[in-house]
């Protein structure tokens, strides 16, 4: 993968290039750019599709603690590096967290948003102790003992094996001396700020996609985003889909994304 050095971080990314409008996909926690493979294949004939690995994920190392505001700055700087003035920002879960913050930071750079299984608020306090336990077990023993639980939250049954291999390879790369690569992204997730009260400042068009069986973020939280945004919002429920609906239900998600993108004004 090519690497862009921005904000003191070497960011791994992919870029289909071409002359079409740019769409930048940002992945969820514990995932990487490959979670959008089906979207890249579907959109590439008409759009310039960019994916990237965020700090502490995939091929991108974190140099220290960071927030989703830093990640928003990263995606905007990556756009600068690639000569992209304006783009649709598409994000799954934490990818949506940073995409919303990018829209707040530089509204003139964000043509539209695609928010997949995401939210604007804080983590549910009822889930926090369990997530802390999972993180600690992952640090101490690797993903093996908890990967089935994690996969069931993100993917639901039946699509686990490929991600098991990814998680174990990543852990082996960092253990035992560089496990802060796991902790810094986790703390970013758990300690993030609540931007629900600022949603009205986001006035670009938005597509909100959410799985009806999302065990990580209830659909009601996506409805809160829809209702709070200051611009036109299209809301699509993906029937039966878990947290990573673009991975498990790519046909439905791709159809909705293409319909939304094709309906945007030029520019």
List PLM regions with ranges.
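Conserved HGGG/HGGXW glycine-rich cap/lid loop of the alpha/beta-hydrolase fold
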Residues: 9-64
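Active-site loop/oxyanion-hole signature of alpha/beta-hydrolase fold enzymes
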Residues: 37-41, 50-90, 255
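Flexible "cap/lid" loop of the alpha/beta hydrolase fold
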Residues: 100, 104-105, 110-141
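Conserved alpha/beta-hydrolase catalytic His-Asp/Glu region
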Residues: 124-129, 143-200
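Short beta-strand/loop motif that positions the catalytic acidic residue
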Residues: 202, 208-210
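Acidic catalytic loop of the alpha/beta-hydrolase fold
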Residues: 213-217
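Catalytic histidine neighborhood in serine/cysteine hydrolases
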Residues: 223-244
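Catalytic histidine-centered segment of alpha/beta-hydrolase-like enzymes
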Residues: 241-254
């Amino acid at each position: 993968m090519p690497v862009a050095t921005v904000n003191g971080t070497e960011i791994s990314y992919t870029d289909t290039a071409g002359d079409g409008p740019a769409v930048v996909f940002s992945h969820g926690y514990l995932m990487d750019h490959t979670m959008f493979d089906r979207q890249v294949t579907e959109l590439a004939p008409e759009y310039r599709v960019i994916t990237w690995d965020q700090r502490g994920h995939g091929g991108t190392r974190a140099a220290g603690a960071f927030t989703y505001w830093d990640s928003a700055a990263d995606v905007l700087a990556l756009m600068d590096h690639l000569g992209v003035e304006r783009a649709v920002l598409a994000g799954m879960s934490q990818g949506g967290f940073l995409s919303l913050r990018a829209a707040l930071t530089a509204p003139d750079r964000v043509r539209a948003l695609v928010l997949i299984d995401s939210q604007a608020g804080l983590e549910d306090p009822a889930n926090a102790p369990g997530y802390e336990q999972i993180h600690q077990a992952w640090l101490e023993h690797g993903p093996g003992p908890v990967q089935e639980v994690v996969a069931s939250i993100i993917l639901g049954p039946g699509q686990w094996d490929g991600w098991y291999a990814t998680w174990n390879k990543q852990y082996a790369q960092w253990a035992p001396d560089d496990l802060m690569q796991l902790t810094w992204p986790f703390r970013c997730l758990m300690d993030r700020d609540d931007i629900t009260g600022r949603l009205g400042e986001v006035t670009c068009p938005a597509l909100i996609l959410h799985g009806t069986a999302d065990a990580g973020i209830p659909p009601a939280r996506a409805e809160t985003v829809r209702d709070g945004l200051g611009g036109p919002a299209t809301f699509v429920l993906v029937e039966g889909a878990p947290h990573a609906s673009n991975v498990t239900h790519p046909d439905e998600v791709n159809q909705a994304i293409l319909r939304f993108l094709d309906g945007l004004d030029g520019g």
